Amino acid sequence: FDEENGGWVDRDKLEPKHFKKWVEFCKARGLGCDFNPTFFSHPKCDPLTLASPNEETRRFWINHGKACIRISQYLAEELGQPCIMNIWTGDGFKDIPADRMGPRMRYKESMDEILSEPFDFNLVKPCVESKVFGIGVEAYTVGSAEYALSYAAANPGKCIPLMDNGHYHPTEVVSDKIPALLTFFPELALHITRPIRWDSDHVVLLDDETKELCKEIVRCGGLDGRVH
C-alpha cells in the first residue's frame, strides 16, 4: 500500500518512500524497526516463490526481496539502529516430491541474487529462517533447518541464522540450540513465540522454555549484541 499517494503498489515495486510513516512513528517513540519480505498471500505464489521453476514467478519474488533490502537500509539509516530483515518462505509440497534437490537449488540461487543487492551489514542484518512443516506443505519444506543453517554458514557477512521456537519438531527446544549456534556464528536472531502443538503463534508467556531461552542468551554472552 502506497501511504504517500493513497494507492496500491505491488511487492516488487515497493520503495523506501512508501515507509516514511513507519519512520515517523518509530522516531516519535525512540524505536528501531525490523522488516521482512512477504513471500506468501499473493497471486504470484504458484504455490512456490523463491523456489519456483517458473522464471517469471521467481523473478517477481527476487525483485521483492531486493526491494526489501533497500527498504531495510533506509529504515536503519533513518532510525540509527540495525534493521533485522528476515527471509522466510512457505515454499514446499503437501506430498512427497520426486525432486527434493531442485527447489533448494533454485531457492539458493534466489537468495544469492537478493543478497547481491548492495547493503551495509552493520546496518542491515538479513536472516534466513527455517520451518519443519506448514499447512499444505506437510511432506516437504524447501527451507528446512539444515538448509537455513547451511546457507547462513556459507554466507558470513551477508546473512545470519534465525530460529523461531514454533518452527521445529515439538520435542526440540530452541534454548538448547542457542549455545550450539553461538559456538560458530557471531550473531543470530530469534522469533520468540508460543506454539501449541504446532506453529500457532499464541501470545508469549513466561513459561519454562521462554525462561530457558533467556537464561541461555545471558549464559552465552548474547546480551552484547550477538542475539537479536
What are these regions (language model features)?
Residues 100-228:
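Active-site capping/gating regions of soluble enzymes
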